[in-house]
Amino acid sequence: MIEQFFRPDSVEQALELKRRYQDEAVWFAGGSKLNATPTRTDKKIAISLQDLELDWVDWDNGALRIGAMSRLQPLRDARFIPAALREALGFVYSRHVRNQSTIGGEIAARQEESVLLPVLLALDAELVFGNGETLSIEDYLACPCDRLLTEIIIKDPYRTCATRKISRSQAGLTVVTAAVAMTDHDGMRIALDGVASKALRLHDVEKQNLEGNALEQAVANAIFPQEDLRGSVAYKRYITGVLVADLYADCQQAGEEAV
């Protein structure tokens, strides 16, 4: 239960508070995760990011830059946001939650269901932290230390990309979320959430340049999901393979229409 609430007005002050209280303190963005089961925090000190001026969207030489405190719904409403990212933002089913949650909080929460991560992985998003460090989102997920996330950068925001979520109902548990993207130089990206302990890319499958049934089978063989109330291992492998192959076909069609 949070007993102390600090509201610094600069990144430097926020970092100093974190250095002072270390593991006793938690970064507080929108609060949708820290105040709700199953991600409710047990930390007693909260460091609010509300006054750090991180709620913005900008362009820099063709790259899309998003402040970590940008709320999901206003971000989804922005007309210039890439279609796949807009689609993924809608996977957070409740408009109320989208108005509270921040994109940085969704990344940092590292929850079991992370419906935004596949599209960010497929778009090769980079993360900027309060100490000036920049990491690819894939590297961050491999070692998600307790850093202060300040910015998300997508250098190629309009690459051909498609994403989809499979769930039992709109508000129900997600079986799998997938995103597929095609790049100009080094082939496809395949990113998944829901079939492993964290979101991941299928690098080995990407290198094979497959499509159709061959792609379905390769994806199914590359993942090792656990059986639970969302489905059996066989079902999860099957539906994930079909989903990725369909998304790849969508990307191919979109690329042809753009020519």
UniProtKB/Swiss-Prot annotation:
Signal peptide position in this chain? none
Q: Which residues form the FAD-binding PCMH-type domain?
A: 1-159
Concerning InterPro entries, the annotation shows:
CO_DH_flav_C, CO_DH_flav_C_dom_sf, Diverse_Substr_Oxidored, FAD-bd_PCMH, FAD-bd_PCMH-like_sf, FAD-bd_PCMH_sub2, Molybdo-cont_Rdtase_FAD-bd_su, Mopterin_DH_FAD-bd
Q: Which GO terms describe its molecular function?
A: FAD binding; oxidoreductase activity
Lineage: superkingdom: Bacteria
- Per its record, how is this protein called by name? Uncharacterized protein YgfM
Q: Which organism is it from?
A: Escherichia coli (strain K12)
Q: What gene makes this protein?
A: ygfM
